[in-house]
C-alpha cells in the first residue's frame, strides 16, 4: 500500500508534453528506431530498445540540439496475413497447432472474428502502440508517424520509387534460387516469417544411389565411407517416384525437398521402411544389405574405410567432393552415376503459419548485395560509423556473408513490384530507407494511413520522390504543389543524415546491414548514417521473456504496475550493449520508493527557502570553504563529468550510478562531515535533476518548473580539484583497515592513529632514482610500463641495479625493496597525498569513534608512511 500511494504521488507530479520538431536555425539531431511489427501490443523487450533512442534524444535536447525522434509501424509481410488466415481456419473448426484465438483474447479482445481480416490488425495495433508510447512519455513527434503496405498510398509509392531506382542502378536481377520455403504459404519463408529456425539456411546433402530390383533407394552417405550396410526405420514413410526415366525411393522428408527442386517428378507409391528390410542393394559396385530397425532413424549408408581397396574409398571421396560443388539446373538435380545432391534446411524451420519448411528452387527477384563494388562502399560506410567494436565486427562479418537477397513474395501484405505486379516486396526490403519519409511526412498527409491528404495521392509518382531526394526539377503536373514539395525537400536536407539508428543486435545481419546497403546506393555520402547502437535481448526477472511460459509483460502492464518514471529508471539499469539485459520487478518497485525520497529531499530543501545560487558566485568563495563544502562541490563536479560521459556512450547504468546513487551517497557523507550549506545542496539537487532528465523527463520537468526556474541545460564540470574527495576516500579506507585490525584484538578502548609526514629515507632515495630515470624515458618518448609488459625494457634493469645499491646501504631486504620500487614505478600517483592527513583525521575523528566505539587519538609518527597510517590499540 505504501508503494501504491507513493506511486500515485509521483504520477500526479509528472508533466507531459507534446514534442514537435521542425526545421530551424539550431543544430539538428535525428534519432530513429527500428519500427516494430504490428501483430500485437508492445512488450518490455520493445520498450527496452526504444528507451535507448528515447534517452539519447532527451540528452541531445539538453545539449541544445533540435531533436527529431519519429516513430512508425511495420505491417508488411506474411505474419499478419498468416495469423488472420489461421484464425479463420480455427474459427471454422479446423485443428491448429497454435491457437491464434487465444493469443488475441490474451491481448484483451473479446470479439476475435474481425481479426480474420488482415487489414483489421493493421488498423488496430498501431493505435494501441502509439497510446502505450505516449503513456511512456517518449520524446516522439507523432505528426510524422505512418503505417507501411499499399494501404498507405504514399508509402506504397515511396517504396515503388526505391525499387525502380535500385533497378535503374543495376542492383536487381531475376532468377531461380534454393530458398527456405513454407508449403502452407507457398512462398519463401524469411527469418521474420519463422516461428522456429531463425538464421537457418539451405544446406546441400549428398545421397547415395542404392540399386535393387524395384528401383533406386536414396540414402545419406558420409564422406570416405565405402558402403557395406544400409539402415532404415521400419515405420518411416518412403515415397516411390519417377525422375529422369528412373524409379526412386526416398524418405518422405527428403522427397518433399527433392520434389520442390526438380521438374518432371511423378509420384508412384508410398511404402514403409520395412519394405526394404533384408533386401540386397548395389552401391558403387559393392553389395549392400539393408536392415530395417524399430526406430525412427534416417535412411543412411554405413561402412568403413576399405583397406583392401583404398582406391575405391578415394574415388568415393572425390565423387562426393565433386558433386558438392556442382549446382542444380532449373529443372534437374545435380547427380552422378552413384550420387545425387539435394538441399534441405540445416535445422528444422517452422513458419508462423505452422508449416514445416522445406528448401525449394523458386523464381525470385533479387537484390544483388553480392556486388563487390557496392560492398566496398558499404565497407567505407561501416568504417566511418560510430558504434561499439562488437557491433562493427558483426556488421563486417555480415558484409562478408551476404549475397543475393530474394525480395519477391506472393503472400502477405506490402507493396507490389512495380514492373511485376504478381509479386510483393518482402518485409526486410521495404524497411531500409523509410526513415527518409519521417523528415517530411507531415507535409503530405496527417493520419497514419494517408487518408487525410495534404498533397493529393493521385499525383504521387517517381517524379515526386526524384524532386525531394535527387534535387531534380519539378515537372509541369506537380507545379501547383511546388510549395509542399519544396518544404519536403528542405526538411529532408535539414534532418538527414540519420545521426543515431537504434535496434536489436539480432537485426545486425539482416535489417541493419540492408539499411546501410540501401542508403549507400540511393543517397549521397553526406546522407549516409553516422551512428548505430544495438542492444541484446531483455530477460524478465532473470528468465527468458515468453508468452507461453507466462513470464511476459507488456508496456502497459509495466506502466500500470510501476509508473512511468520507475519503469524508465529500471530500463536504464537493465543493461548496456549487446549483452542480454534483465528487467527485475523488485528493482522497479524499489525505484518507486527511491524516486519518492528524491522528490521529498528536494521539497524539504527548497520549501520556505529562496535558493537559486549561481555557480560562479559559489566558486568565488570556494577557497574559503571548509572541508565538507569543498568535498561536496568536488563530488558534484566529478559526477557530472562521469554521468555526461556515460550519456555520450549510451551506458545508462552508469548515468544512474553517477547521476543518482553517487550524488545521494555524497549528500549523506556531507551531513556526516558536518556540512550545512543549503546552496551547495541545492546545486547537487539541480545537477541530479539535469543529469536524470533524459531518463525521467516528466518528473524532472515538474522539479524544474517548481524549484529550479532557470533555463535548463546539461550541467558541465566546474572543478578539477579532488583533494577533499581523496581525503574522504582516505578517511573511509582508514576506518575499514582499523575495523579489520580491531577484530583481532580481544579488548581495547583507545586507538592511536599514527600519521606519516614523509617516507623513510631509503624509500625517498628509491623514489628519486625512479623519478629521474622516468624523466629520461619521458624525454625519449619511452613508455616504461608497456616495455615491462613485453619484458624487453632497457631501463628496468638500470632501475633495479640503482635500487639494490640503496637497499644495501640501508640494510633493507631486497625482495621488499624491489617490490616497493616496481609498484612506485607503475603507480606513482598512489604515493602522492594532496591533503593534510593529520588535519583530516583530527577534524573527523568523531566519524571513526562513532563507527568503532573507540576513543581516537591522532598523532604524527616517523614510523608511518604517508597515506597508510598505523594503529596502536590500548
UniProtKB/Swiss-Prot annotation:
List UniProt keywords, sorted A-Z: Aminoacyl-tRNA synthetase, ATP-binding, Cytoplasm, Ligase, Nucleotide-binding, Protein biosynthesis
Q: Where is this motif: 'HIGH' region?
A: 36-46
- Write the signal peptide boundaries: none
Q: Which GO terms describe its cellular component?
A: cytoplasm
One GO MF term attached to the UniProt entry: leucine-tRNA ligase activity
Can you say where in the cell this protein is located? Cytoplasm
Tell me which EC number(s) this protein carries.
6.1.1.4
Please tell me where ATP binds in this chain. Answer: 547
According to its UniProt entry, the protein's GO biological process terms are: leucyl-tRNA aminoacylation
- Location of motif 'KMSKS' region in this chain is 544-548
What catalytic activity is recorded? tRNA(Leu) + L-leucine + ATP = L-leucyl-tRNA(Leu) + AMP + diphosphate
Matching entries from SUPFAM superfamilies are given as: Anticodon-binding domain of a subclass of class I aminoacyl-tRNA synthetases, Nucleotidylyl transferase
Which EC class is the enzyme in?
A: ligase
Task: Family membership, please give it.
Answer: Belongs to the class-I aminoacyl-tRNA synthetase family.
Question: What is the name of this protein?
Answer: Probable leucine--tRNA ligase, cytoplasmic
Q: Which organism is it from?
A: Encephalitozoon cuniculi (strain GB-M1) (Microsporidian parasite)
